[in-house]
Curated annotation (Swiss-Prot):
Protein role: Catalyzes the conversion of 4-hydroxy-tetrahydrodipicolinate (HTPA) to tetrahydrodipicolinate.
Binding site for NADP(+): 36
Protein family membership: Belongs to the DapB family.
Domain of life assignment: Bacteria
SUPFAM superfamilies: Glyceraldehyde-3-phosphate dehydrogenase-like, C-terminal domain, NAD(P)-binding Rossmann-fold domains
EC number of the protein: 1.17.1.8
The protein, known as: 4-hydroxy-tetrahydrodipicolinate reductase
Source organism per UniProt: Halorhodospira halophila (strain DSM 244 / SL1)
Binding site residues for (S)-2,3,4,5-tetrahydrodipicolinate: 157, 166-167
Sites where the protein binds NAD(+): 9-14, 35, 99-101, 123-126
NCBIfam families found in the cross-reference section: dapB
InterPro entries on file: DapB_C, DapB_N, DapB_N_CS, DHDPR_bac, NAD(P)-bd_dom_sf
Pathways per UniProt: Amino-acid biosynthesis; L-lysine biosynthesis via DAP pathway; (S)-tetrahydrodipicolinate from L-aspartate: step 4/4
């Protein structure tokens, strides 16, 4: 039986890519799609919006109705919608794949409450390559982190509105956790002017916004006489959309709880 997927934020870049990937992938179909009230995508056919021809699925702005019409929900919209999506998933008993980054405290709490009732996958990045990178970064941090200056460099397209990226922050958390540090206390975001010598306990973040870069992330471990750089470069958003669709098929089989991509691929 085909799995019906509801796509929240269908009018955005990732939303359109999700429609395309779901349409092309066997075993799943677009059951419902929403965009923000007043958005240009509302009222259009989801398939036509994504360049896939008519799917007979109009894009609406009623999140609870879209969630109820779906077997699983994928949300790549904005943090402002997260609490509404979580409440709708709780009411309908639908598992959620959440790709929204930049969540505030109340939004994170809503996600955690939802995970007590249904399976929730929340990841900053749905690429299997980035998931593997995170595991490798943890290993490197445990092996050489205490002897290294650690910097995280990320690059994205000019339209990205948050910095550092959610993926960069997750990589920073992986390093900090491996070293027993608190990222909120040791992170340094950019440098300017007379900064003095580098504090060896810090984890640095550098951000690049330019052109149409899909997403590059490098974690650099700098030691005396050598350095190790672990890098992932995405060339297409398809990798993120495909990972999210695989996650949706996975979460419907899981008990209630909060999961990430590492749970799914086993690293």
């Amino acid at each position: 039986m085909s799995l019906g997927i509801g796509i929240i934020g269908a009018g955005g870049r990732m939303g359109r890519m999700l429609i395309e990937v779901v349409h092309r992938q066997p075993g799943v179909h677009v059951a419902a799609a929403t965009d923000r009230t007043g958005g240009e995508a509302v009222g259009r056919d989801a398939g036509e919006l994504a360049g896939q021809g008519s799917l007979g699925v109009p894009i609406g702005d009623d999140i609870p109705a879209a969630v109820a019409a779906s077997d699983a929900v994928i949300d790549f919209s904005l943090p402002e919608a997260t609490e509404t999506v979580a409440a709708a998933c709780a009411e309908a008993g639908r598992p959620l794949v959440l790709g929204t980054t930049g969540l505030g405290e109340t939004q994170r709490e809503a996600v955690h409450r939802l995970a007590e009732q249904v399976a929730v996958m929340h990841a900053a990045n749905y690429s299997t390559g980035v998931t593997l990178l995170t595991a490798l970064v943890e290993q490197a941090a445990r092996a050489i982190g205490v002897y290294s200056d650690i910097e995280i460099i990320e690059a994205h397209h000019r339209h990205k509105v948050d910095a550092p990226s959610g993926t960069a922050l997750r990589l920073g958390e992986a390093v900090a956790d491996a070293l027993g540090r608190d990222l909120s206390q040791c992170a340094v975001y950019g440098r300017e002017g007379h900064t003095g010598e580098r504090d060896p306990q810090t984890i640095g973040f550098e951000t690049i916004r330019a052109g149409d870069i899909v997403g590059d992330h490098t974690v650099l471990f700098g030691g005396d006489g050598e350095r190790v750089e672990l890098t992932h470069k995405a060339s297409s958003r398809t990798t993120f959309a495909s990972g999210a669709v695989r996650a949706a098929a996975w979460v419907v089989e899981q008990p209630p709880g909060l999961y990430d991509m590492r749970d799914m691929i086993g690293v």
